[in-house]
Structure formats: structure tokens, C-alpha cells
Amino acid sequence: MGNLVIGSRGSELALWQANHIKERLKKECLIESEIQIVKTKGDKILDTPLNKIGGKGLFTKELEELLLKGAIDLAVHSLKDVPVVFEKGLDLACITKRADVRDTFLSVKFPDLMSLPKGAKVGTTSLRRSMQIKLKRQDLDTESLRGNVQTRLKKLECGEFDAIILAEAGLCRLEIQGAKYRKAFSVEEMIPSMGQGALGVEMLKNHKHFATLQKLNDEKSAFCCRLEREFIKGLNGGCQIPIGVHASLMGDRVKIQAVLGLPNGKEVITKEKQGDKTKAFDLVQELLEEFLQSGAKEILEKAQLF
């Protein structure tokens, strides 16, 4: 039998992630594999903000189509990019141990967000980040920043932006120091995206190695990420809308923090729930109900106009 084929986007970070799974497959599952690079819609359209391109699965759809055809055996994703509803026959075979979940501030001239001058230009791909930046500093100018990690850093160094916000996990995986000033926000300062820091391996549910890949699953990370995905699912959300949600375990207790609002930092709802781990999914439903009662659906409809 030939090697398993891993589908991956072509960026340096995506290939790091695919190679990480390839190495673990060999070491922990005794399975040989090879990587096939796939360009997704999100990779091809680089001159438009992600939320303007439209549709879910901007970084996953082409990979899912190849999975369904049997052209690749598994697809490695940043879990935050994976839609919460799967194409029929597909599912996550595993969720890996989470890396650092935080978002990170980078700048050549300024040590942190609060030291930026009025009107400073902050680059981010994410409406979620833009919303939380504007909530703290309404006077800042948040602008779309596309491209891979290195491209974004180059734009910062060339002076196109006064600061940019990137995921700490990506910087750590690529061993990038970044700019002169680098400061991670706490989860309380900026609630991450669902699944941020984790990798999701997607396969056909009837693939003969689907169960085998459970060996790569991290139970604690998977539990927390599934709670976050359940919250997003309840709001009909995706990764291109201004919602942050983070679940964490502290012994037998779970804490779920969430934020939702307009990208301009207006009409923001922030709530959290804590309780027994055994009641975790009930807590998600309670949190959802509170958000819906506070007008979450209406706010998300308005957010589509940005």
C-alpha cells in the first residue's frame, strides 16, 4: 500500500503544521505519508479582506473536495479555520494539543497597544481582533492585512503599519522573533478565536485509518475546542465574523469566555460561565442563551455590513 497523502496549504506555517502531523504519524502510528500542496480560495484572493470574499471554508473547501474524491487521505488545518458544520461524510479525526492561544501585538516603534498614537494604523486579518482593539482604543485605525506571516511582518517593517496583530502560536511554530516590540495579550485582554492554537486533522469518517489517528488526539485540548465550536455553531458563526470564545479547564472545573460585537468596537457583549466539567456543554447552552437574549443575532447581522 502507498503512503497516506496529507493535503496542506502551501504557506510556510501550513507546511510546518503538515510536517508536524507527518512526523507524528510515523512515530506514533507507524504510518508513512507524503504532503500534497493545495491552493484554497483564501490563498488565491489576497487583495480583498477575508470577510468581503464571503462564504465559509475559505481555507478548507478545496481540501475537503479532495478528501471527498479520495484524492488525499487527510487534511491538516488550523482548527480556527475549520467550519463548525462538515460536508457529509467528513469529520475531525483528531485535535492536537493546543499551543499558545493568545494574540500578539508587534511593532517596530511602539511597545504595546496603549502606547500607539491617535490614528495609528493597526493591521489584522480578523474582525474579532479589530473589534477588541477598537473596544480598547476607538481612536486607532484598524486595516486589513493579508498574506503569510513573513509578508505581514515585512509590511510592518516597511512602515505600512504602526503595529500588527498575529497569533502567538504561528510565531512560535516558525520560531520568529518578529518585530522589535512583541507583546502577547492575555486571554482576558483579547479573547481568541475558537480552536486557536490547535490543529485539526480532517478525514472521511469511513477511512480505514480514521480511528488510528485518535492516537494524535489531545483529550483536554479537544474537549475545550469542541465547547468553543459548539458555541460558534449555536450562533451560526464562522471564523470571518467578530466572535471570540475560549474554554479552559482548571481541574474539574471549566471556564468559558466569549465576546461578540461589531468590528468598530460598538455593541460589544462579553460574558463568561464557570462550572463543573461534567456540565460543560450545558454551560455553553446557558452562555448562548444569554448572548441571544442580549441581541447577539442582530449584532451579527449588522456586522455583515462592515
From Swiss-Prot:
Any one GO CC term of the record: cytoplasm
Subunit annotation: Monomer.
Xref: CDD domains: PBP2_EcHMBS_like
Catalytic activity, reaction form: 4 porphobilinogen + H2O = hydroxymethylbilane + 4 NH4(+)
PROSITE patterns attached to this UniProt entry: PORPHOBILINOGEN_DEAM
Cofactor binding mode and count: Binds 1 dipyrromethane group covalently.
Protein's organism: Helicobacter pylori (strain ATCC 700392 / 26695)
Function: Tetrapolymerization of the monopyrrole PBG into the hydroxymethylbilane pre-uroporphyrinogen in several discrete steps.
Cofactor(s) essential for the protein: dipyrromethane
GO process annotations (BP): heme biosynthetic process; protoporphyrinogen IX biosynthetic process
Signal sequence annotation: none
Additional free-text comment from the UniProt record: The porphobilinogen subunits are added to the dipyrromethane group.
UniProt keyword Transmembrane helix present: no
Family recorded in the similarity comment: Belongs to the HMBS family.
Pfam families in alphabetical order: Porphobil_deam, Porphobil_deamC
Molecular-function GO terms, alphabetical: hydroxymethylbilane synthase activity
The protein's Enzyme Commission number: 2.5.1.61
InterPro entries, A to Z: HemC, Porphobilin_deaminase_cofac_BS, Porphobilin_deaminase_N, Porphobilinogen_deaminase_C, Porphobilinogen_deaminase_C_sf
Enzyme class: transferase
UniProt-recorded name of the protein: Porphobilinogen deaminase
Name of the gene: hemC
Pathway(s) where this gene product acts: Porphyrin-containing compound metabolism; protoporphyrin-IX biosynthesis; coproporphyrinogen-III from 5-aminolevulinate: step 2/4
Residues where S-(dipyrrolylmethanemethyl)cysteine is found: 239
Keywords: Porphyrin biosynthesis, Transferase
